[in-house]
Amino acid sequence: MTPDTLMTPEKIFLDGKTFIPAEQLPIPEWPCVVSERSQPTLTVKDDDLFFVTDTIGNISACSLNDGNPSMGLFCCDTRFLNRLELQVEGRSPVLLSSTAEKGFSLSVLCTTPKIDDRLKAETIGIRREIVLNGALFEEIEVSNYSTTTVNFELTISFDADFVDLFEVRGYDREKRGRLLRLVEPTAEEGTFSLVDGVSPIPKESSTSREESLTLAYQGLDGSVMESR
């Protein structure tokens, strides 16, 4: 635990931020895309930071449970992301090409599947550039190849389990720390709302800060780790 960390039985205060145990504010799960077969993986690396993903650039929570448990964003032998999944209307994009030949970056070109009668197959091109340089950076470019306007939902889902490499390889731990949620006080004293955009926050607060997503974990030694 650092000198800037204060704790109560229900809250953790760290560098001006407030965390509470994740079970106090459960987040509705966003369905993952189930693949009928095990997906090949690509790996990019920068010093002690490495990223194992499928060829689309996704880390699917379903894949972790169905044959690819080693995928994720890792640093210092800990997995800081166990889900990073881009979906088109709840479906996986269709891969056209991907390469990780540079070693520290991943380039992906994919397109959209057919979505009922609203979106024809291969109407939209999606280019993903994922780079490791002390952190993970991603740029997404979306191109419309039709002659008309199209409407569709493009989503990216994140999650972090903060397991170590031994757990990834199948070893069990007798005890684990706890997952945390970053929250902000609401106008009503004693209540909190999620900063992650799932629950509304006070209007004056939302306009004064950048939109962000923070996933956190408190280890058995009291230290707090964050994925931001």
Where are the regions that the model predicts?
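Terminal accessory carbohydrate-recognition/targeting modules of carbohydrate-active enzymes
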Residues: 1-228
